[in-house]
């Protein structure tokens, strides 16, 4: 038995994978969603599902707030219960999580480093300098602190971090396969090449100390695009002859390159999975028509609520018009309805284009998929 529970996470991601083989069971939590996800949806889901009171693995794909906050809340809940000698919501066996310092390969405090870099840059008037510094530092400090808090909480709860890896969840020469009970995890990313690129962007930004008009833009480019795209933990899970691809906020081009380089594409240059977690909430900045024609699925899962225009119209059209190797009706699973979805459904008849849309019930905490 293999099930994927898609937890309502609004504009973020939160998934629970459940696998059973005889008396053996495996439960994996991937990402925790943004603010309020834990109290409103993840906690009730963990209480409702028969998970034997355990999470064999918790994975944080990357440190954006719409992925990490729910995990912070979960660990805080467990910590409070343990301190009060109360029954713990779940037992967490291990955590996969790449810290910001490891990603950037620095032992220096990033907040201090940034603060000092601002002191050497001409940002115009003191008022402009304070405004620019404040806006960037708020974003930076929040992200760094949340990543550090998760590491600190995990250590205080004695939860092993990345025990199967040399410090970081990372692909060096090729996808790393880890067998865990009845599930095989193939780590597709992040790659050493992409992390080297991210570190170079970071160091270049610090060294160049660009002037006012480019300073904020350059850093926000790294924060908003480079870090999610280049550092996302991307997993191909195989169990019960089924495949589920978790992409985080990774890049479609990177996924294709990895599959191609490792000889995983078929003779037609395609790769099929039973469930595809569509990258970056369906944003067209991370994917292309080529991606969906190369990587196709029976079920496409999009966790989004319209924020940042996700899922985008182009992404939906690319999925609907993509090649389908199985000739089965493809299913697109949405956690929420949005104006873009309504628009595309009006223009693309489901029967004519051989696809079906499934929406989470707004009164439910999660939707369950049984890949078949």
Predicted features and spans:
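Conserved beta-strand hairpin/beta-sheet module of binuclear metal-dependent hydrolase folds
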Residues: 1-54, 227-254
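C-terminal regulatory/interaction regions
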Residues: 2, 13, 253, 257-265, ...
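Hydrophobic/aromatic beta-strand patches that form the interior of the parallel beta-sheet core
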Residues: 5-7, 28, 59, 96, ...
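Active-site environment of divalent metal-dependent phosphoester hydrolases
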Residues: 11, 36, 63-69, 102-104, ...
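Active-site metal-binding motif and surrounding structural segment of the metallo-beta-lactamase
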Residues: 25-26, 39-94, 265-285, 296-301
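Acidic/histidine-rich helix-loop elements
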Residues: 32-37, 83-84, 206, 285, ...
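Flexible, acidic/histidine-containing loops and adjacent segments that form or flank the divalent-metal
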Residues: 78-243, 329-337, 343-372
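Long, well-ordered mid-to-C-terminal structural blocks that present hydrophobic/aromatic surfaces
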Residues: 235-291, 296
């Amino acid at each position: 038995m293999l099930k994927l529970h898609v937890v309502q996470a609004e504009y973020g991601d939160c998934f629970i994978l459940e696998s059973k083989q005889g008396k053996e069971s495996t439960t994996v939590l991937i990402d925790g969603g943004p603010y309020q996800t834990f109290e409103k949806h993840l906690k009730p889901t963990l209480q409702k599902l028969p998970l034997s009171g355990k999470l064999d693995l918790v994975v944080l794909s990357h440190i954006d707030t719409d992925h990490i906050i729910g995990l912070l809340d979960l660990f805080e809940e467990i910590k409070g219960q343990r301190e009060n000698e109360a029954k713990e919501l779940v037992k967490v066996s291990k955590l996969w999580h790449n810290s910001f310092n490891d990603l950037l390969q620095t032992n220096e405090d990033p907040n201090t480093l940034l603060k000092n870099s601002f002191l050497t840059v001409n940002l115009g008037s003191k008022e402009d300098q304070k405004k620019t510094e404040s806006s960037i530092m708020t974003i930076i400090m929040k992200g760094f602190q949340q990543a550090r808090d998760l590491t600190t909480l995990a250590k205080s709860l004695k939860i092993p971090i990345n025990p199967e890896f040399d410090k970081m969840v990372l692909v060096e020469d090729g996808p790393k396969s880890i067998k865990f009970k009845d599930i095989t995890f193939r780590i597709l990313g992040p790659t050493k090449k992409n992390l080297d690129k991210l570190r170079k962007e970071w160091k270049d930004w610090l060294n160049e100390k660009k002037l006012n008009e480019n300073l904020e833009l350059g850093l926000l480019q790294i924060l908003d695009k480079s870090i999610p795209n280049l550092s996302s933990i991307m997993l191909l899970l195989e169990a019960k002859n089924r495949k589920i691809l978790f992409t985080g906020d990774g890049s479609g081009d990177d996924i294709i390159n990895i599959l191609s380089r490792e000889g995983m594409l078929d003779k037609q240059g395609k790769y099929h999975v039973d469930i595809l977690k569509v990258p970056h909430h369906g944003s067209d900045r991370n994917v292309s028509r080529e991606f969906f024609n190369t990587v196709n699925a029976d079920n496409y899962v999009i966790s989004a609520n319209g924020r940042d225009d996700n899922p985008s119209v182009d992404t939906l059209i690319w999925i609907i018009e993509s090649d389908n190797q199985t000739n089965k009706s493809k299913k697109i699973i949405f956690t929420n309805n949005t104006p873009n979805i309504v628009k595309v459904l009006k223009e693309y008849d489901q029967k004519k284009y051989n696809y079906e849309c499934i929406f989470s019930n707004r009164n439910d905490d999660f939707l369950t998929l049984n890949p078949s």
